[in-house]
Amino acid sequence: MNWISNVVRPKIRSFLNRRDVPENLWVKCPETGQMVFHKDLEANQYVIPGSGFHMRMGPADRLKATFDDGAYEEVALPDVPIDPLKFRDERRYIDRLKDARAKTGAQDAVKVAHGLLEGLPVTVAVQDFGFMGGSLGMAAGEAVVTGLFTAAEKKTPFIMFAASGGARMQEGILSLMQMPRTTVAIQELREARLPYIVVLTNPTTGGVTASYAMLGDVQIAEPGALIGFAGPRVIEQTIREKLPDGFQRSEYLFEHGMIDMVVHRHQMRETLARVCRLMMKAPGVPPKGRLPAPAAA
């Protein structure tokens, strides 16, 4: 061995060694194929800069983008029985839960928080499609109910960001039971004369659409979101007909009177604040740089 083998060879070996590169450094737009650096996408609230396509947004980013200065207090959620049916298909349900929790760092599909939206106290729940497709089970149902009761107790509007493939089949009737439970909790919020605002994101389907996702006093949707009960392919196979272009997309639902507005994610916070203030009869916030008009003598 000489200095060449001691110095040159190790350098060549280290140069040729494959470096581990994270898989999510670049994100591809599903519509145009445009590649976007992940930090640029995060800074743009997960909206593709060129096409305007709205990618899925996790609960932490959603809450940060909604509350003033990104500051909020998470609402503690009650524990629920885990896998009471001892369900198993290709894998045990308990194993699927463990994988989802390890992947997302969350206990289940819904996170609830309380904070300020342009100075107005609000309670917000966010459904995470990344956790088993945002499916509605006992834990998610309990989280929505807890959020509604928290809003009623604190006398705040309740904002629900919905994203789900439907009821969680591994929990059977216990999952379906969450549909009437959440509906009853919404009615209690209404009896307290407090606003319930729903933001439908891509996708919102199944039992979630058939319950709390379509019961808002104001129904808002993000652009291009898939919203419906059964998916378009299932409907086409059932009725044996071709569906209209854009069927079940947020723009189609708006044109046919199923939702109140379609709002770009960059305008969502401002829109939610305006709707909450209007429904709570709270004083408006003057535009930045402009002082409120003096009170009449």
From Swiss-Prot:
GO cellular component: acetate CoA-transferase complex
Location(s) in or outside the cell: Cytoplasm
Uppermost EC category: transferase
Predominant localisation class: cytoplasm
Signal peptide interval: none
UniProt-recorded Gene Ontology molecular function terms: acetyl-CoA carboxylase activity; ATP binding; carboxyl- or carbamoyltransferase activity
EC assignment: 2.1.3.15
Annotated catalysed reactions: N(6)-carboxybiotinyl-L-lysyl-[protein] + acetyl-CoA = N(6)-biotinyl-L-lysyl-[protein] + malonyl-CoA
Biological processes annotated in GO: fatty acid biosynthetic process; malonyl-CoA biosynthetic process
Sequence ranges assigned to domain CoA carboxyltransferase N-terminal in this UniProt record: 25-294
UniProt keyword list: ATP-binding, Cytoplasm, Fatty acid biosynthesis, Fatty acid metabolism, Lipid biosynthesis, Lipid metabolism, Nucleotide-binding, Transferase
Similarity comment: family membership: Belongs to the AccD/PCCB family.
Subunit structure: Acetyl-CoA carboxylase is a heterohexamer composed of biotin carboxyl carrier protein (AccB), biotin carboxylase (AccC) and two subunits each of ACCase subunit alpha (AccA) and ACCase subunit beta (AccD).
Function, in words: Component of the acetyl coenzyme A carboxylase (ACC) complex. Biotin carboxylase (BC) catalyzes the carboxylation of biotin on its carrier protein (BCCP) and then the CO(2) group is transferred by the transcarboxylase to acetyl-CoA to form malonyl-CoA.
PANTHER family: ACETYL-COENZYME A CARBOXYLASE CARBOXYL TRANSFERASE SUBUNIT BETA, CHLOROPLASTIC
Name used for this protein in its record: Acetyl-coenzyme A carboxylase carboxyl transferase subunit beta
Organism field: Azorhizobium caulinodans (strain ATCC 43989 / DSM 5975 / JCM 20966 / LMG 6465 / NBRC 14845 / NCIMB 13405 / ORS 571)
